[in-house]
Amino acid sequence: MSDGEEKPDGFSFAGIAAGLKDSNKKDLALILAPENSICSGLFTQSIVRASCVDICEQRIKKSSGLIRAILINSGQANACTGDYGIQHTLFATKEVSQLLGINEEEVLMCSTGVIGIPIQIKNLIDNLPNLVKELKTNSLQNAAEAILTTDLVDKKITIETFIEGRKVKISGFAKGSGMIYPNMATMLAFLTCDVGVDKEEWDKMISIAVKKSFNAISVDGETSTNDAFIGINSGKKIDKKFLSKIQSGIDIVCQSLAKNIARDGEGANCLLEVLVEGAKSNSDAIKIAKSICNSSLVKTAINGCDPNWGRIISAAGNSGIDFKLDFLDLYIGDFQILKKGKLNKYDSKKVANYMQTRMNGKYLVEDIVSISLHLNSGSEKGTAWGCDLSKKYVEINSEYTT
Amino acid sequence: MSDGEEKPDGFSFAGIAAGLKDSNKKDLALILAPENSICSGLFTQSIVRASCVDICEQRIKKSSGLIRAILINSGQANACTGDYGIQHTLFATKEVSQLLGINEEEVLMCSTGVIGIPIQIKNLIDNLPNLVKELKTNSLQNAAEAILTTDLVDKKITIETFIEGRKVKISGFAKGSGMIYPNMATMLAFLTCDVGVDKEEWDKMISIAVKKSFNAISVDGETSTNDAFIGINSGKKIDKKFLSKIQSGIDIVCQSLAKNIARDGEGANCLLEVLVEGAKSNSDAIKIAKSICNSSLVKTAINGCDPNWGRIISAAGNSGIDFKLDFLDLYIGDFQILKKGKLNKYDSKKVANYMQTRMNGKYLVEDIVSISLHLNSGSEKGTAWGCDLSKKYVEINSEYTT
């Protein structure tokens, strides 16, 4: 399968079935970046990390971001696998480097899937020549499929714009919260951009984008052993005054992927979008919004189409960020629930009906439940995303699998 | 109804139905402490607090803990009720003080129930004379019932010991995580002790006990607008060398109530008890244990009797506390799962069977799923408690109530 859209110049992608998953679905992906590409990565903050994550960090640092290839496997997360973890990562990246004729230090590896079971290394190695052969500029779709675990849909986006007559493209793909035993949600996301940006600047831009996207979503408040976001740029540089335009593009790609992940959370029926305005800082706003998205009580209320504003305000109150109850304006959809902290007259049946409609709306178009909270204490704002908490979530995650 | 057990000397209790709840169940409680009693209180850290909580804090501080009475109502939480909040609290505590012939500053008030709806103040005030008339030394049971919302069982405990021939008693009662629309879990707990302890010492002792009990439980990670723990002591003082014995007693009472609350979490089938040993500090150990108790993925795995150790380790890794994966010993029940970070041979069917048995075991006797994690990095330990996450939890909290 190939994509219709034009991808960032110089990058090629591959995704194949290498027999790592029992399902025989695609499970091995590769991204090849042009020479002199600049790479930044942000990785799980968990103490328990897969060793492939450590190697990613080390190699990006050591090479000052001069990374050429990223190998990604699904099926086994290669975490908590003792000495196998690092051995298999080193072995696989070395093989890839030899096939591509590059330095092994220029190859990264990300894994997602079952924890505690060694990677199916023989199948992986045997299929590397085939994987490399499949590298094409228009195979991003295959790569996006190959990194999925039990995600219900693939998650990818390409955007383009013209800057001084030059066509500029940014592509991203990601996987979200699939579950395989014994496992947890893992987030992997990759971004490519065909405008050259210096390492230091790129680090900043990636970090800004992640703060407003992947770090602003929550499916179930869990951080995985393998979470990773890697962004690579390559190509002719651009006048500094246009960098803000590139930043906007990266933000759009990251937010789109992040929303896709939240919406595809286990058992979810809607995307929950929480906007907090009137905060003292953007990060305060995001913290409050995230606290609301993270609340089991808010998430179950949404699942039940119950405009339970007390839970929303209480979750905001638990964010650790100071605000005045008497200043709050709260909206669910277009319905104002609180006005300067006091209950506004609203038709709770209409609000419930709004939620009900959204719970059954068209995927990522009309299935967004919006909550907005104005603190009236500053001029900054921020958004976070989540999903409802359903019986299906419990079912998926409590399935008897041993 | 009166209790069989002997309660702390000098304290009396009452609990009646005052028409605050639609169910006509008991909904108004009173604790009367002897003159010169010493009171300490710990309250919700949420930014959104009921004004009765503010008044509790102010009065305890202003009087240096010289508190005589605590009025507690269930039915309405008196939070997010605008000016009514403080007016009703002041009115009710003033009335109580006049009926008891004490200073209004010596009366505290705690509320739990529906948020955003004013307290049924007329019913409350009309019933105060009756409440005061009901005060008896052996009516703790009535008080314990009157503070419940949708708790399935009442939660109370009295312990006694002899110190140099003197009989010493400590009693406590609490309510946990009931739900009424629009509402969230509220925890209220009260402790009385008939040994006199100075304010400064008592503050410390209460704070130590709470850290190891109420602050170490999680039903769904939510903090309420009204959470409160209040401990009062009164009576002859005791040689300082015996204070550690009193501390142990307070710890036992608080932990018993805390475990009761965790076990009675919505939809729960078991008590989850997580012991973390070999930590650098007690608070590190509790943080890790709590992170495990808080994990939706661990809680659903337990609900499914799935010995999903990857989720346990991952939750530990998200606690923010540093540890070495290679040092970890992990047990579920008596089954060793990890040995110095490596998978131990165990019969996963037997582990699943252990969990299954516990999920159907006798209430708070044989229904405890134990997880223990040894970090092998220090000599401190700590325990936290939670419960499984069931479809019933989602059902209870997503019920369509508007």
From Swiss-Prot, chains A, B:
Stated name of the protein: Arginine biosynthesis bifunctional protein ArgJ
Catalytic residues identified in the record: 186 (nucleophile)
CDD domains assigned to the protein according to its UniProt record, in alphabetical order: OAT (cd02152)
Record's keyword terms, sorted: Acyltransferase, Amino-acid biosynthesis, Arginine biosynthesis, Autocatalytic cleavage, Cytoplasm, Multifunctional enzyme, Transferase
Function field: Catalyzes two activities which are involved in the cyclic version of arginine biosynthesis: the synthesis of N-acetylglutamate from glutamate and acetyl-CoA as the acetyl donor, and of ornithine by transacetylation between N(2)-acetylornithine and glutamate.
Binding residue positions for substrate: 149, 175, 186, 266, 397, 402
Record family assignment: Belongs to the ArgJ family.
Pathway where it operates: Amino-acid biosynthesis; L-arginine biosynthesis; L-ornithine and N-acetyl-L-glutamate from L-glutamate and N(2)-acetyl-L-ornithine (cyclic): step 1/1; Amino-acid biosynthesis; L-arginine biosynthesis; N(2)-acetyl-L-ornithine from L-glutamate: step 1/4
Reactions mediated catalytically: N(2)-acetyl-L-ornithine + L-glutamate = N-acetyl-L-glutamate + L-ornithine; L-glutamate + acetyl-CoA = N-acetyl-L-glutamate + CoA + H(+)
Gene Ontology biological-process entries: L-arginine biosynthetic process; ornithine biosynthetic process
Lineage: Bacteria, Bacillati, Cyanobacteriota, Cyanophyceae, Synechococcales
Keyword Hydrolase: no
Subunit-level organization: Heterotetramer of two alpha and two beta chains.
Gene responsible for this protein: argJ
Keyword set includes tRNA-binding: no
Pfam family, one: ArgJ
One MF annotation (Gene Ontology) recorded for this entry: L-glutamate N-acetyltransferase activity
Localization: Cytoplasm
Site entry: Involved in the stabilization of negative charge on the oxyanion by the formation of the oxyanion hole: 112-113
